[in-house]
Amino acid sequence: MAAGSTGERPFFEIITSVRYWIIHAVALPAIFVAGFLFVSSGLAYDAFGTPRPDTYFQAGESKAPVVVQRFDSKAELDTRLK
């Protein structure tokens, strides 16, 4: 072992090994597919409590609602959502 070495394998040696690619050839695509299904199924919206893209605006609106009264904002939004 060289002076100052931590005893770990060099990164280049790891990524050029067959064992690394056998493991990661399955793991990396599986993570990608799982993430794609998590988002495309809508489960991500339910898990994090965010509104779905089609529920941001009412049917008749073409832009984001603007709250005019600062201290009555909840009442203003409640009347808009009725």
UniProtKB/Swiss-Prot annotation:
<dbReference type="Pfam" id="PF00284">
    <property type="entry name" value="Cytochrom_B559a"/>
</dbReference>
<dbReference type="GO" id="GO:0020037">
    <property type="term" value="F:heme binding"/>
</dbReference>
<keyword id="KW-1133">Transmembrane helix</keyword>
<dbReference type="GO" id="GO:0005506">
    <property type="term" value="F:iron ion binding"/>
</dbReference>
<keyword id="KW-0813">Transport</keyword>
<feature type="transmembrane region" description="Helical">
    <location>
        <begin position="22"/>
        <end position="36"/>
    </location>
</feature>
<dbReference type="InterPro" id="IPR013082">
    <property type="entry name" value="PSII_cytb559_asu_lum"/>
</dbReference>
<dbReference type="Pfam" id="PF00283">
    <property type="entry name" value="Cytochrom_B559"/>
</dbReference>
<comment type="function">
    <text>This b-type cytochrome is tightly associated with the reaction center of photosystem II (PSII). PSII is a light-driven water:plastoquinone oxidoreductase that uses light energy to abstract electrons from H(2)O, generating O(2) and a proton gradient subsequently used for ATP formation. It consists of a core antenna complex that captures photons, and an electron transfer chain that converts photonic excitation into a charge separation.</text>
</comment>
<dbReference type="GO" id="GO:0031676">
    <property type="term" value="C:plasma membrane-derived thylakoid membrane"/>
</dbReference>
<keyword id="KW-0812">Transmembrane</keyword>
<dbReference type="GO" id="GO:0009523">
    <property type="term" value="C:photosystem II"/>
</dbReference>
<dbReference type="InterPro" id="IPR037025">
    <property type="entry name" value="PSII_cyt_b559_asu_sf"/>
</dbReference>
<dbReference type="GO" id="GO:0009055">
    <property type="term" value="F:electron transfer activity"/>
</dbReference>
<keyword id="KW-0249">Electron transport</keyword>
<keyword id="KW-0793">Thylakoid</keyword>
<dbReference type="GO" id="GO:0009767">
    <property type="term" value="P:photosynthetic electron transport chain"/>
</dbReference>
<keyword id="KW-0602">Photosynthesis</keyword>
<comment type="similarity">
    <text>Belongs to the PsbE/PsbF family.</text>
</comment>
<comment type="subunit">
    <text>Heterodimer of an alpha subunit and a beta subunit. PSII is composed of 1 copy each of membrane proteins PsbA, PsbB, PsbC, PsbD, PsbE, PsbF, PsbH, PsbI, PsbJ, PsbK, PsbL, PsbM, PsbT, PsbX, PsbY, Psb30/Ycf12, peripheral proteins PsbO, CyanoQ (PsbQ), PsbU, PsbV and a large number of cofactors. It forms dimeric complexes.</text>
</comment>
<protein>
    <recommendedName>
        <fullName>Cytochrome b559 subunit alpha</fullName>
    </recommendedName>
</protein>
<keyword id="KW-0408">Iron</keyword>
<feature type="binding site" description="axial binding residue">
    <location>
        <position position="24"/>
    </location>
    <ligand>
        <name>heme</name>
    </ligand>
</feature>
<dbReference type="InterPro" id="IPR013081">
    <property type="entry name" value="PSII_cyt_b559_N"/>
</dbReference>
<keyword id="KW-0472">Membrane</keyword>
<dbReference type="InterPro" id="IPR006217">
    <property type="entry name" value="PSII_cyt_b559_asu"/>
</dbReference>
<keyword id="KW-0604">Photosystem II</keyword>
<keyword id="KW-0349">Heme</keyword>
<keyword id="KW-0479">Metal-binding</keyword>
